[in-house]
Curated annotation (Swiss-Prot):
CDD domains per UniProt: DHQase_II
Family annotation (PANTHER family): CATABOLIC 3-DEHYDROQUINASE (PTHR21272:SF5)
Gene3D superfamilies: Dehydroquinase, class II (3.40.50.9100)
Sites where the protein binds substrate: N75, H81, D88, V102, S103, R112
One Pfam family in the UniProt entry: DHquinase_II
Name of the protein in its database record: Catabolic 3-dehydroquinase
Reaction(s) this enzyme catalyzes, per UniProt: 3-dehydroquinate = 3-dehydroshikimate + H2O
Recorded metabolic or biological pathway in which this protein acts: Aromatic compound metabolism; 3,4-dihydroxybenzoate biosynthesis; 3,4-dihydroxybenzoate from 3-dehydroquinate: step 1/2
Length: 153
């Protein structure tokens, strides 16, 4: 059975490629999503993508993943440092997740050093640029076990 992966990108990641390219690079989110889908398919997995600048929309998408998703890769953006709601949603659906950041958040402003997700993530990828998405997809596709499907919330 094909492994299903959900890739979630949080606030401002829709601006990848144009926002602070000296930090985030020039690759667009659309490019990242298409490349990630192709890489997942080459590894026998399916990948859905979702991006929102709104915390509640991200929570709703995580809830909708319950019962039909084996793993989540999430770049929570600025919500990394503020969102107990997204953390609780991830824990509530019991889907293993990888936390991902394009930049090295630990080499940036002190307020970016704290994450509400890191202590519960199956893995954390930080500072590899958009290549981190490929690493995350490959790790999930090759190492995560399919979950027993449950009823959606």
């Amino acid at each position: 059975m094909e492994k299903s992966i959900l890739l979630i990108n949080g606030p401002n990641l829709n601006l990848l490629g144009t926002r602070e390219p000296h930090i985030y690079g020039s690759t667009t989110l659309s490019d990242v999503e298409e490349s990630s889908k192709g890489h997942a398919a080459s590894l026998g997995a399916s990948l859905q993508t979702f991006q929102s600048n709104h915390e509640g929309a991200i929570v709703d998408r995580i809830h909708a993943a319950r019962g039909n998703t084996d793993a989540i890769i999430i770049n929570p953006g600025a919500y990394t440092h503020t969102s107990v709601a997204i953390r609780d949603a991830l824990l509530g659906v019991e889907i293993p997740f990888i936390e991902l950041h394009v930049s090295n958040v630990h080499a940036r402003e002190p307020f970016r050093h704290h994450s509400y997700f890191s202590d519960k993530a199956s893995g954390i990828i930080v500072g590899l640029g958009v290549y981190g998405y490929k690493v995350a997809v490959e790790h999930v596709a090759l190492n995560f076990k399919p979950l027993e499907k449950k009823a959606a919330l």
